[in-house]
C-alpha cells in the first residue's frame, strides 16, 4: 500500500525549506540533499522560476522525491504549484483560501501560525499540519511544548532557526516533523563548489532522526 503524503512526512521527519538565488542553484542544492538521503523538499515561491523548478524536480526524480511548495499566500499560487507537482503546500502565515484550495485539490495544507489563537484558527480551518514560524524566535522547543499542552491533538512543524543542535529538543517537545532552512540549505556551499557539505549535513539530520526514534522506541519497550 502506497504511503500518504502525511505518512511520508512523519516517517521522514525532515522538510528542507529551499530558498535560492537562482533556479540552477536550487537544483544543485536539491541534488546534493538527495545524495545525502533527503526524500522531501519544500520549494519556496521566492526561488526564481519556482514553478519551473518544481516541474524539473518532478520530471527528474518522480516518486523518489516528495515535493512541496512554500511561501504560498494565494489560492492561485497554491493551484499553480500543485499543477507543477507539489503534493503539499506551505504558507508562512494563515490564509484560509489557500487551505481551502489545497484541500479541494486533494493535497496537504500546512499554513503558518505562531500564537495559540492563530494556531487553533488555522487548524480549525482545515490545516493538516500547522507550521510554527518563526519558532526559534519565541522560545524554540519550550514554546512548542507550551502550545501542545492545551492542544495535544495538534500536528505541529516548527520552522525558523531549527539546527542540528536544537532539532532533538523540538522532537522531544512533540514536533511531527522539522522544517529546516539555512542550516541544511547551504547556498554558500554550492557557490563555493562544495556540495559535499550539504550531503554531509543531510546525512547528519537523518542520522539524528533515526537515533531519536530508536531511543523513543527503547523507552516505550521498557
For each predicted feature, which ranges?
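Conserved N-terminal beta1-alpha1 strand-loop-helix module at the mouth
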Residues: 1-84, 104, 153, 164-165, ...
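Glycine-rich beta-to-alpha transition loops that act as phosphate-gripper elements at the mouths
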Residues: 19-22, 47, 67-75, 91-95, ...
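Conserved functional loop/turn residues at catalytic and ligand-binding sites
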Residues: 37, 61, 85, 93, ...
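Short catalytic-loop micro-motif centered on adjacent basic/acidic residues
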Residues: 40-43, 89, 131-132, 157
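Histidine/lysine/aspartate-rich catalytic loop segments that bind and position anionic ligands
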Residues: 88, 92-138
Amino acid at each position: 500500500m502506497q504511503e500518504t503524503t502525511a505518512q511520508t512526512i512523519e516517517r521522514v521527519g525532515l522538510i528542507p525549506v529551499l530558498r535560492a538565488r537562482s533556479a540552477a542553484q536550487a537544483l544543485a542544492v536539491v541534488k546534493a540533499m538527495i545524495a545525502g538521503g533527503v526524500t522531501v523538499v519544500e520549494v519556496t515561491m521566492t526561488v526564481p522560476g519556482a514553478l519551473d523548478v518544481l516541474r524539473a524536480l518532478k520530471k527528474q526524480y518522480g516518486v523518489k522525491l516528495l515535493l512541496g511548495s512554500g511561501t504560498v499566500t494565494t489560492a492561485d499560487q497554491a493551484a499553480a504549484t500543485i499543477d507543477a507537482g507539489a503534493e503539499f503546500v506551505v504558507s508562512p502565515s494563515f490564509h484560509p483560501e489557500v487551505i481551502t484550495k489545497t484541500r479541494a485539490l486533494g493535497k496537504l495544507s500546512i499554513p503558518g501560525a505562531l500564537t495559540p489563537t492563530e494556531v487553533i484558527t488555522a487548524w480549525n480551518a482545515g490545516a493538516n499540519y500547522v507550521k510554527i514560524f518563526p519558532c526559534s524566535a519565541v522560545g524554540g522547543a519550550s514554546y512548542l511544548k507550551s502550545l501542545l499542552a492545551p492542544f495535544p491533538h495538534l500536528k505541529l512543524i516548527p520552522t525558523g532557526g531549527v539546527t542540528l543542535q536544537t532539532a532533538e529538543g523540538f522532537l522531544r517537545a512533540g514536533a511531527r516533523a522539522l522544517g529546516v532552512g539555512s542550516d541544511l540549505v547551504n547556498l554558500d556551499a554550492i557557490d563555493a563548489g562544495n556540495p559535499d557539505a550539504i550531503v554531509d549535513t543531510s546525512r547528519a539530520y537523518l542520522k539524528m532522526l533515526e537515533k531519536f526514534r530508536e531511543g523513543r522506541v527503547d523507552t516505550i519497550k521498557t
